[in-house]
A protein has these predicted regions:
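Glycine-rich loop-to-alpha-helix module at the N-terminal edge of alpha/beta enzyme cores
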Residues: 1-68
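Rossmann-like NAD(P) dinucleotide-binding subdomain of oxidoreductase/dehydrogenase enzymes
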Residues: 69-187
């Protein structure tokens, strides 16, 4: 797990995610073919899934540009007149993301994108039956400039490890998309 001393700076995260969104758009057909063959769905549905993924990452980029922190006027009493408070957003720590099978590209994008945008490394556990999209996402993020250790993929059939990570005190956030059965196993 990373420490606060080696988080990625905001400008670098924006640049990486912007490149990643562009890569998704540029490789739209290739990614849709992967999602279609992996998930057994029609190609037009997979194209929509890929487009939504690119839009989701671009939304993360725009949110980062607009929301880096706040300056809050403090005039609640005479002693605080003319003073302001500054807030700065900081990463909460590593994110563990467990995802479902039905939209393997889009669901993982909507977990990984916000985690990286927030400055948090992410450990992803894809569905056992649809891991290829997750591996492709991790590969593309590294190609876009994300350090390799920032997006780790747990191999299929490692739900026991994911369950252990849920209770690991070093994990800052847990994201789960999936069935109630798996949710109960993870809790």
């Amino acid at each position: 797990f990373r420490t606060r001393d080696n988080w990625l700076p905001l400008a670098e995260r924006i640049e990486i995610l912007h490149r990643f969104a562009s890569m998704i758009t540029d490789r739209r057909e290739e990614l849709a073919m992967l999602a279609a063959s992996e998930g057994g769905k029609p190609l037009p549905d997979s194209l929509v899934e890929i487009d939504r993924g690119a839009d989701g990452i671009q939304c993360c980029v725009e949110t980062l540009r607009a929301d880096a922190g706040y300056v809050v006027p403090m005039g609640l009493n005479a002693a605080s007149q003319g003073r302001v408070a500054f807030t700065q957003k900081e990463p909460i720590g590593p994110v563990v993301a467990v995802s479902a099978f039905n939209h393997p590209f889009n669901l993982i994008i909507h977990q990984v994108g916000p985690a990286v945008a927030a400055g948090c490394p992410v450990i992803v556990k894809p569905a056992d039956v649809t891991p290829l999209s997750c591996f492709k996402i991790a590969e593309m993020l590294v190609e876009a400039g994300l350090p390799p250790e920032w997006c780790q993929v747990l191999m299929p059939e490692t739900l026991d490890l994911a369950t252990k990570l849920v209770t690991d005190g070093r994990v800052g956030f847990f994201s789960f998309i999936g069935s109630a059965r798996v949710g109960w196993m993870l809790r």
